[in-house]
Amino acid sequence: PFPKTLFLEEHNSSKGFTRFRIPALVTAGNGALIAATDIRWDICGDGAGLDTAVSRSTDNGATWSYTVANYLGDNGNRFNRDSTAFIDPALLADGDTIYLACDLLPAGLAVANAARYPAKAGSTGYDTNGNLLLALSTTSVNGLSSSTARAAASYDYHLEKKADATSESCYEIKNNSTSEVVDGDYTIDDHFNIKSADGAVDTNLFCGDTPYFQFPTDFLYITKSTDNGATWSAPQLVDAKNESEQVFLIGPGR
């Protein structure tokens, strides 16, 4: 569970976190200050279990309240080479609407410091309709395999938003060739959490134990707030990377 107190005075891993990096700051239409940062838990490096905190102040910075805009928590609130990472948040204010964009790295991936899991060029990660491409996890290759093995997998499936989408049941996985929904009786919500009816699957599509995994690259992950940073919407994935690019990264700041 996420700690009740976020910003403490000491870098002490016994309190569940130690470090924050990559700040961003904007002023909302009502004058509120909105700040975002990586929660880097017990490391300073990139990847391997990072999340996103957003703080807001309505009194010109005298006091602050925070929320966790992006959080998966796979493998606990700590460094783990098999974990996902939300990294490098960037903020954009458009009146009272605030947009938060960051890079989402699937389980184990990083750009500069991952010998086994470097992000790969060779695919945008999406089909021609902008749907997230997926490969079936097997004993041979899955969401925790090396990025080389993942890149060589067959991406025969895609994630498609349902016609009758709700927050609890938003997406379905379809076969690229037949457009049929895959077996497994899965429910996938608007944050890409996936569960099976029999309880055997209860994870997120970007975590290492997903039944269907993505091409090993980063994904542009965007949420928005329409109440000056108090709450945040379900995410949208944006297809912006070229096949020849290893990654397409957000430049954080103000």
State the predicted function of each range:
Residues P1-R254:
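Asp-box/BNR beta-propeller blade signature and adjacent active/binding-site loops
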